Amino acid sequence: MDGFYEKAQQSAEYILSHSTLRPTCGIVLGSGLGSLVDKMTDKTIIPYADIPHFPRSTVAGHAGNLVLGTLAGQTVAALQGRFHYYEGFTMRQVTYPVYVLRLLGVRTLVITNACGGIDRGLAPGELMLLSDYINMLGSNSLMGPNDERFGPRFPDMTEAYSLRLRALAKSAAAELGIACKEGVYAIFPGPCYETAAEIRAYRALGADAIGMSTVPETIAANYLGLEVLGIACITNMATGIAERKHSHEEVLAVANRASADLCRLVERVIEKL
């Protein structure tokens, strides 16, 4: 083995040595969605750069902090910034924080992202619960040697996104008056945006939204035995559907505007756990 388990243990031990909190819920915050940490109390903020073996965020809108604290009565660990395959990270590096969260004691993982809408029934600024995913990366975050201390060689993905958590999220959205649809999320390697022809192909495969993250973490979390909820913030319509060219600035601007609804929804879901 390559010492991956031991490295994750060292990361977890460092984090636990800096806080008395023991999180049971983890949150991955996508582009422009890091403001949820403002709602947390009793916070301990640990920069990724300080944690042994942790990768470093390089994309605008990803602060690069692990935040331990209390939210809606639950002890949570929030990843304020994620790692993407297109940044040149290996799949192990992209998903490394999820393994560390598991060793911290996390059993429920809420993954958020900013993505493009393929379903014309979606609109920028709306939220979509992930019901399933389509992995078109040509790679999988579990490839390589398997360590049974983490999970099985061949994990099942029948319910990649928990039916129980999706029901909680639908109930929470209804209570808060937040429009929240459900759909299939497809991952695209990036960093360039998709072509119109690619979007037509993804639509034919059944994708409702598309982005450059989330699926590797989802796979790793299921492998580790975590219950997963995925929430996408639609920041733009996909190529061939949108009337103008895409930019990361546009994504961040819409994500920032929609972050209030996302924060309210995540907070209410965590309250219901």
Where are these regions (language model features)?
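Metabolite-binding pocket within alpha/beta catalytic cores that recognizes anionic/polar moieties
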Residues: 1-157
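Generic non-transmembrane alpha-helical segments
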Residues: 14, 18, 164, 168-178, ...
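Non-catalytic positions within long, well-ordered alpha-helices that form the structural scaffold/packing
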Residues: 102-105, 203, 222
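Short acidic/polar active-site loop segments enriched in Thr and Asp
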Residues: 107-108, 208, 227
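Metal-dependent peptidase/peptidase-like ectodomains
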Residues: 146-185
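Active-site/ligand-binding-proximal alpha/beta "capping" segment
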Residues: 172-208, 273
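Zn-dependent metallopeptidase/amidohydrolase metal-coordination segment
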Residues: 212-250
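His/Asp/Glu-rich mid-to-C-terminal helical/loop segments that flank catalytic regions of hydrolases
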Residues: 239-273
